[in-house]
């Protein structure tokens, strides 16, 4: 029994050791013991800096003083003045607007006069747009079937108008020739027969007259 009690005491001791280790692992300090990251370094270089902040070195001047944020901003602004002088100014259009306003004010409410070159340059894109539209309009109209029909109708009417006087003159000439040709065609035979009959009768009459004259002369 003594041995069993000794073993139990040993086990309790071992379990207490593990429990203490577990308690040490699970211990959490008070909130005041933990510093927020934003407050690190605010106390100055005298305070102990955490180990993970050892890689970061504070910016120092030539005199060895720590540079604050405000001083750093001021120094950056002072150094940037030289760069701004080297860079080209970006406020040129604003000056132009002020000049235009001053011109309008100096003319006592009269509208500003535009230069001839400026007016010509302003009018050119408008004219080009109109020409462009007219060209596109002509192209589009040529593709439309209705416009094609109108063109065909206009062309045919012009052709007919041009051909009407010729047709009238041709019809008149044809009528006149037909009138002249009708007696030659259908009635031509009758006239020719009459003429031939007249020619045949005339020599008979002449022969009769000559015979009568001869008889009268013989009687005398």
UniProtKB/Swiss-Prot annotation:
The keyword Cell division does not apply. Residues 28-41 form the CRIB domain. Functions as a downstream effector of Rho-related GTP binding proteins of the 'Rho of Plants' (ROPs) family. Participates in the propagation of ROP GTPase signals in specific cellular responses. Functions as a downstream effector of ARAC11/ROP1 to activate calcium signaling that leads to F-actin disassembly associated with exocytosis in the tip of the growing pollen tube. Counteracts the ARAC11/ROP1-RIC4 pathway, which promotes apical F-actin assembly associated with vesicle accumulation, to control actin dynamics and pollen tube apical growth. Interacts with ARAC11/ROP1. GO terms for cellular component: cytoplasm. It comes from the Eukaryota. Residues 61-77, 209-220 have a biased composition (Polar residues). This is CRIB domain-containing protein RIC3.
